[in-house]
Amino acid sequence: MSFIITIAVIVVIVLFVISVYNSLVRARMQTQEAWSQIDVQLKRRNDLLPNLIETVKGYGKYEQATLEKVTQLRAQVASASSPADAMKASDALTRQISGIFAVAESYPDLKANENYLKLQEELTNTENKISYSRQLYNSVAGNYNVKLQAFPSNVIAGMFAFRPADFLSTPEEEKAVPKVDFGSNGLGE
């Protein structure tokens, strides 16, 4: 009788370990899937950028440095070895793209260019998707990391060498409150 109880306890423990292990694997896979959604949007943006660069190229020689920086950052995003590196390059690229859009305000012909307007809309939509995907990734990564730290799954995670997922943080430049100057009387007059 005690032999059957011992076997039953061992079976319950093994089933519990399998259940927790599978739960951790699912959470890790969801984190990887969430990252792949970001990666898809980064690739989409990288595919749109050559068209934007070609469209903007003829509208000002002093912006050439900005276009070269965009090309360089685009390559960094594509060749990043980790999600954190990809997002660091991506954040810098986002700032450069915003700079291109700001400079375009000085060129009425460019602002009226239908191809430019389409690209601007596509890139804006893609940036919004990247932002949403980052939020989703951080949420899923947070859930996964909680499972890694909560008892008893932390014991199983340690036994099978599960590693926590990195969060994607917002760069300090983007957290800063923008300075707005409407002139001396506050109305731009």
From Swiss-Prot:
Coiled-coil region(s): 110-138
Bilayer topology annotation: Single-pass membrane protein
Q: Where in the cell is it found?
A: Cell membrane
Q: Which UniProt keywords apply?
A: Cell membrane, Coiled coil, Membrane, Transmembrane, Transmembrane helix
What does the entry say induces or represses the expression of this protein? Expression is maximal during the early to mid-log stage of growth and decreases after. Does not respond to heat shock up to 43 degrees Celsius. Part of the lemA-htpX operon.
Q: Which Gene3D superfamilies match?
A: LemA-like domain
Knockout mutant characteristics: No effect on extracellular glucosyltransferase activity, nor on growth characteristics.
Establish whether keyword Glycoprotein is in the entry. no
The family database entries (InterPro entries) matched by this protein are listed as: LemA-like_dom_sf, MamQ_LemA
Listed GO cellular component terms? plasma membrane
What residues form the membrane-spanning segments? Answer: 1-21
For this chain, the family text in UniProt reads: Belongs to the LemA family.
PANTHER family membership: MEMBRANE PROTEIN, PROTEIN LEMA
Name the record gives this protein:
Protein LemA
Its gene name is lemA
